[in-house]
Amino acid sequence: MAVLQVLHFPDERLRITAQPVKEVNADIQRIVDDMFDTMYEEEGIGLAATQVDIHQRIIVIDVSEERDQRLVLINPELIEKSGDTGIEEGCLSIPETRALVPRAEHVKVRALDREGKTFELEASELLAICIQHEMDHLVGKLFIDYLSPLKRQRIRQKLEKLAKQNSRAR
């Protein structure tokens, strides 16, 4: 298992639309395991394969405090959503940035699990928000896309400055 490098905005690879997984095999399972290692190392609650430069429809999530409730969504499809909610979201690909994003309060998704078996899941609250956030990544959408152009530009400038500081520190 390995910790993968997380892409950071404004890296254009974050905008690539992920392709469906054709077959859940040992390679896909290894990607899933590496994604969990990466997510836990980065102290996140969700990670889409796009964020680690793997452009396949794979999401890993664990919103539990104990970090023991792993959820794998391969080729997820949103089949129902209802209600309105929103929280200040953050993202491993957009460090040190949070913003309020409107989301559905409840969702129902269909996906494949780590073994390739189809399942459906109903989720609400934080899990529903996390699923929607990660599914956005699979189509090249970031949570800052919900913000005004001015706020997005400020975030871009802040992150470019941070990247320059980090590269000088190395």
Curated annotation (Swiss-Prot):
Keywords on record: Hydrolase, Iron, Metal-binding, Protein biosynthesis
Cofactor(s) in the UniProt record: Fe(2+)
One family name in Pfam for this protein: Pep_deformylase
Residues that bind Fe cation: C91, H133, H137
EC nos: 3.5.1.88
Cofactor binding note from Swiss-Prot or TrEMBL: Binds 1 Fe(2+) ion.
Listed GO MF terms: metal ion binding; peptide deformylase activity
Database matches in InterPro entries: Peptide_deformylase, Peptide_deformylase_sf
Recorded superkingdom: Bacteria
List of catalytic residues: E134
GO BP annotation list: co-translational protein modification; translation
Catalytic activity: N-terminal N-formyl-L-methionyl-[peptide] + H2O = N-terminal L-methionyl-[peptide] + formate
Entry's transmembrane regions: none
Family: Belongs to the polypeptide deformylase family.
Functional description taken from the UniProt entry: Removes the formyl group from the N-terminal Met of newly synthesized proteins. Requires at least a dipeptide for an efficient rate of reaction. N-terminal L-methionine is a prerequisite for activity but the enzyme has broad specificity at other positions.
HAMAP family documented for this protein: Pep_deformylase (MF_00163)
NCBIfam families on file: pept_deformyl, PRK00150.1-3
PANTHER family: PEPTIDE DEFORMYLASE
Protein name: Peptide deformylase
Annotated gene: def
